[in-house]
Amino acid sequence: MKNSFGSLFSFTTWGESHGPSIGVVIDGCPAGLELHESDFVPAMKRRRPGNPGTSSRKENDIVQILSGVYKGKTTGTPLSLQILNTDVDSSPYENSERLYRPGHSQYTYEKKFGIVDPNGGGRSSARETACRVAAGVVAEKFLANQNIFTLAYLSSLGSLTLPHYLKISPELIHKIHTSPFYSPLPNEKIQEILTSLHDDSDSLGGVISFITSPIHDFLGEPLFGKVHALLASALMSIPAAKGFEIGKGFASAQMRGSQYTDPFVMEGENITLKSNNCGGTLGGITIGVPIEGRIAFKPTSSIKRPCATVTKTKKETTYRTPQTGRHDPCVAIRAVPVVEAMINLVLADLVLYQRCSKL
């Protein structure tokens, strides 16, 4: 099982949803980065369950630094972080020992490895993403020294959709960070949709958009280390992610070259792009404008409606998520800080690569 991501700035997550704890080991973080346990609080608070429109599971998600920091600064040695699981209830998963939950990885894990922990989804649970967010905090602090910043937001939920990318501004950042749904969309409209989902015992997918600050360092490693390829790999590894696009993405397939091509223009003494249909990269290398993209998330399969399945003895039956089950009606909401974390982890890796690219 592959549990690590990254090359020079890499991380390995460990633990299961209903185990005693989960955690992450970061390797390659440069020495001298100021880091305290309090630095993790804002990001972990955004991702943790118990917020409006999310799972009722209540975890404190307090990050403990176990190694790699001395007197408030990273030492360059492996940085180990731990998060305790404090609100575990495995009772809704008792039936999972005899049948396969539709739409979940339980069946494929069991057939591949011969054994699987079904409680809370085990290793495949979105609980694992808390580790990614913790690692992303370290990457974000490192990138701040390079003047690189990432912002993600819920841009589509049901009939609510933002038709285009938004530009980073203090007002937008404040609006997203103060929204319980991490979105510039109207909060009351989102709540109406979530209430309807709850009443219907159903779930819904969503789209997360992201944008970075302009990146002037020409990050990216052709041919197989292209920025957008690495971002796609990172973001599509998030549970429930089902689609990725950079810039105009799939819409570019319906455009003419005269419409799509971004002209070069001068901005003072700097060369830049007049438009950003490419999404911030040419040849897989950043070009000094923001990276823009979107990720689509499927509706969760954990819904309190009956669905056809089979038992482990190959008998057809039905399965319904127990009323006591605790699941998100829209996983895209809590995925916003996870998206930011994975982007920051990719960019931190590429910044270190860039330092090795030429004399």
From Swiss-Prot:
NADP(+) binds at residue 47. This is Chorismate synthase. It comes from the Bacteria. Reduced FMN (FMNH(2)). FMN binds at residues 123-125, 283, 298-302, 326. Belongs to the chorismate synthase family. Its cofactor is FMNH2. GO terms for cellular component: cytosol. It catalyses: 5-O-(1-carboxyvinyl)-3-phosphoshikimate = chorismate + phosphate. Gene3D superfamilies: Chorismate synthase AroC. GO terms for biological process: amino acid biosynthetic process; aromatic amino acid family biosynthetic process; chorismate biosynthetic process. One of its GO terms (molecular function) is FMN binding. InterPro entries: Chorismate_synth, Chorismate_synth_AroC_sf, Chorismate_synthase_CS. Keywords: Amino-acid biosynthesis, Aromatic amino acid biosynthesis, FAD, Flavoprotein, FMN, Lyase, NADP. Pathway: Metabolic intermediate biosynthesis; chorismate biosynthesis; chorismate from D-erythrose 4-phosphate and phosphoenolpyruvate: step 7/7. Homotetramer. Its EC number is 4.2.3.5.
